[in-house]
């Protein structure tokens, strides 16, 4: 047998041995280590068009032995000029969420300020979230549909929206979180936004001109100043933070002073950073930790009050 034949035989034997070993190996499926992101296309009757939303499901959500398990839910709202998928594409939300047993929903709000428009009858982004989105989530997914298991948060425009939902619908949420919130947006005038014309152009279509009824009804500071004591006691816990280099830094400080003066339960943090995804990627981790803690230690039931 020449050297080439011996070499060929050796290769055949080695390959055969490897194949035999492989045939006896049990290949385990890769374990899922990050939460799963699923997109839902929802046909809104109130807004008159399809509004997608993302759902971040817990790592073990699909395990057969957990098919009867229900989860708390955190709604995260995007900012102005953003969309429903910002949280899952601009932050490591799915990775961070893998540590927690909660469902996270990121709705589409377009540039509607999470408000029922005073000028466009079909732009009902506040009613959509309360009357359509939340019921749809609770129908499609295994979420607990009680106040103690529901939280809402957001960044910038979404921070404004989250706080507003907490103030207007305190019986629905146990926790509100605002990151760099545009908390006084309903009071902004054109002169306030000189140099930020693109932002200004989104406001009149939603809130109307001047002191319109829609502006007044969605002015967070006015809403909080006029709340009677029994409604203050019914508010969810409010978490706020803002970067010290953020253009909205002072307005967040002013808002917190109002919370303090009215003795509204809250936590406020000032941190290095600006109005950027780098800041929000870091701070959403704190929101998840706070939500998980709140869900584990639910607040007492709060009597429903009309918004």
Regions found by a protein language model. Give the residues of each.
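Bacterial N-terminal signal peptides that target proteins for export
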Residues: 1-9
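Bacterial N-terminal signal peptides
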Residues: 8-17
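Non-catalytic cap/lid and distal C-terminal segments of serine-dependent acyl enzymes
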Residues: 21-307
């Amino acid at each position: 047998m020449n050297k080439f034949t011996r070499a060929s035989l050796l290769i055949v034997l080695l390959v055969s041995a490897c194949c035999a070993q492989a045939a006896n190996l049990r290949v385990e499926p890769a374990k899922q280590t990050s939460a799963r992101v699923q997109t839902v296309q929802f046909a809104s009757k109130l807004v008159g068009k399809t509004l997608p939303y993302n759902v971040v499901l817990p790592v073990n959500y699909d395990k057969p032995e957990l098919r009867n398990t229900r989860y708390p839910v955190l709604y995260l709202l995007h900012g102005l000029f953003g969309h429903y998928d910002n949280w899952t594409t601009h932050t490591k939300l799915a990775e961070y969420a893998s540590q927690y047993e909660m469902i996270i929903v990121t709705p589409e709000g377009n540039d509607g300020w999470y408000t029922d428009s005073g000028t466009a009858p079909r732009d009902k982004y506040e009613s959509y979230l309360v009357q359509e989105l939340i019921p749809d989530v609770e129908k499609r997914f295994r979420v607990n549909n009680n106040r103690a298991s529901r939280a809402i948060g957001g960044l910038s425009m979404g921070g404004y929206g989250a706080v507003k939902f907490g103030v207007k619908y305190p019986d629905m949420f146990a926790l509100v979180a605002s990151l760099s919130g545009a908390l006084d947006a309903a009071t902004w005038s054109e002169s306030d936004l000189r140099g930020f014309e693109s932002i200004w152009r989104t406001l009149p279509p939603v809130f109307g001109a001047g002191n319109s009824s829609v502006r007044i009804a969605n002015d967070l500071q006015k809403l909080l100043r006029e709340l009677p004591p029994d409604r203050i006691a019914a508010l969810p816990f409010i978490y706020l933070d803002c970067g010290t280099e953020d253009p909205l830094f002072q307005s967040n400080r002013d808002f917190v002073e109002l919370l303090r003066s009215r003795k509204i339960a809250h936590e406020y943090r000032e941190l290095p950073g600006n109005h950027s995804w780098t800041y929000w990627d870091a701070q959403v981790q704190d929101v998840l930790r706070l939500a998980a803690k709140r869900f584990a230690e639910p607040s007492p039931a709060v009597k429903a009050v009309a918004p």
